[in-house]
Amino acid sequence: MKKRISTIANLVQSFNPKLVYDIGCDHSYLTSYLIKTNQNLTIVNSDISKNALLSNYQKFKNNNNIHFFVSDGFNNLPELNINPKIGVIAGLGGLKIINIISQKENFINRFVIQPQSNLIELRSFLSLNSWDIVNETLVQDREFIYPILVIEKLKKPFKLTKELVILGPKLINFKDKHCLMKHYQCLLRVYQPKQKPSLMDLKIIETLNKIITSYESS
């Protein structure tokens, strides 16, 4: 978990934000990491669990720059007049991330996101709804490989090809090919067992098999 959190924090810090919204903050590990390097950073932590937030509040109650809100996504979040701002949604399923960034209350145009599932469906949504994937990386933490994306809202639509939706427009040039292939193999195991695969499922299986086979024979 430490490597995953540190990677997310480094991506957040690369934009030099003054305000961070950690949506679905869970135990506020990201807040703990961020304030070590920037005590002046304003951080809004939100979660649907009141009990989790109460526990987190006790850790940070003496820091006036750290705030806590019980909220399902943006439903109960205030838009603070501090810029630049960035949102983080980490450790939630891809479909839940889609739900959150689609909310009409969403006022953030840049996010670091780390989906636990439905990565390809998430990329497809981003492509169809004018969100640009400006960065994507993989982090291996113990036996798990986590995809982490930086996305920004575009003014004009920009659609990815099906192949790039499946493979990731930034991941195809990922330097650690062994880690990348392990990631693709994990994705393949999600789609292969389906009894009634859709046309998109079949395209995903074909594309992943093709690139994995190419890597293994090289």
Swiss-Prot record:
Its EC number is 2.1.1.-. GO terms for molecular function: tRNA (adenine(22)-N1)-methyltransferase activity. It is an enzyme of class 2 (transferase). Keywords: Cytoplasm, Methyltransferase, S-adenosyl-L-methionine, Transferase, tRNA processing. InterPro entries: SAM-dependent_MTases_sf, TrmK. It is found in: Cytoplasm. It comes from the Bacteria. The keyword Coiled coil does not apply. GO terms for biological process: methylation; tRNA processing. GO terms for cellular component: cytoplasm. PANTHER family: TRNA (ADENINE(22)-N(1))-METHYLTRANSFERASE. Belongs to the TrmK family. This is Putative tRNA methyltransferase MG248. It comes from Mycoplasma genitalium (strain ATCC 33530 / DSM 19775 / NCTC 10195 / G37).
